[in-house]
């Protein structure tokens, strides 16, 4: 072998040594902060809701409670002509809830006034309507 061939082999060996010494030792370990988990975080979020068979049956719509008292009040004109055989009617409501709804829900307050105070349904409250004696 001539001198140029030895020189090429020596340069190649030196290049391999440089590459090997510059390479990381063993397997790369992460020293940085772990990457956050993507996607859904909990089991409840991993299931579809509101889509067909997976949707929970809504039994609350059948019960009359404080949550749907306003809907029951709005539907009262349609139910006046029907005989009520429904055992789920709401007999009384808490005063604190009623006051809170009157203050925070203008649609509810408007419905209560239309249903129970504005007797002639003219959109105006007369002194007779406001001061009538409810027995």
Curated annotation (Swiss-Prot):
Question: What biological-process GO terms show up in the record?
Answer: neuropeptide signaling pathway
Q: Which GO terms describe its cellular component?
A: extracellular region
Transmembrane segments in this chain: where?
Answer: none
Q: Which UniProt keywords apply?
A: Amidation, Cleavage on pair of basic residues, Neuropeptide, Secreted, Signal
Propeptide positions in the record are 55-135
Q: Specify where it is mainly localized.
A: secreted
Q: Describe tissue expression.
A: Allatotropin: Expressed in corpora cardiaca (CC), corpora allata (CA), antennal lobe (AL) and gnathal ganglion (GNG) (protein level). Expression in AL detected in all animals, expression in GNG detected in most animals and expression in CA and CC detected in few animals (at protein level). Allatotropin-PP-1: Expressed in corpora cardiaca (CC), corpora allata (CA), antennal lobe (AL) and gnathal ganglion (GNG) (at protein level). Expression in AL detected in all animals and expression in GNG, CA and CC detected in some animals (at protein level).
As for what it does, the entry says: Neuropeptide stimulator of juvenile hormone synthesis.
Q: What is this protein called?
A: Allatotropins
């Amino acid at each position: 072998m001539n001198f140029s061939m030895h020189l090429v082999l020596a340069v190649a060996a030196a290049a391999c040594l440089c590459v090997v010494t510059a390479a990381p030792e063993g397997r790369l370990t992460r020293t940085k902060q772990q990457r956050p988990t993507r996607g859904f975080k909990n089991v409840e979020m991993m299931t579809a809701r509101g889509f067909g068979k997976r949707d929970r049956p809504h039994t609350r719509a059948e019960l009359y409670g404080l949550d749907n008292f306003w809907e029951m009040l709005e539907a009262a004109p349609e139910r006046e002509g029907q005989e009520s055989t429904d055992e789920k009617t709401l007999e009384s409501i808490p005063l604190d809830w009623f006051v809170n709804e009157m203050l925070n829900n203008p649609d509810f307050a408007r419905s209560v006034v239309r249903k129970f105070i504005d007797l002639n349904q003219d959109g105006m409250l007369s002194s007779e309507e406001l001061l009538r004696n409810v027995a």
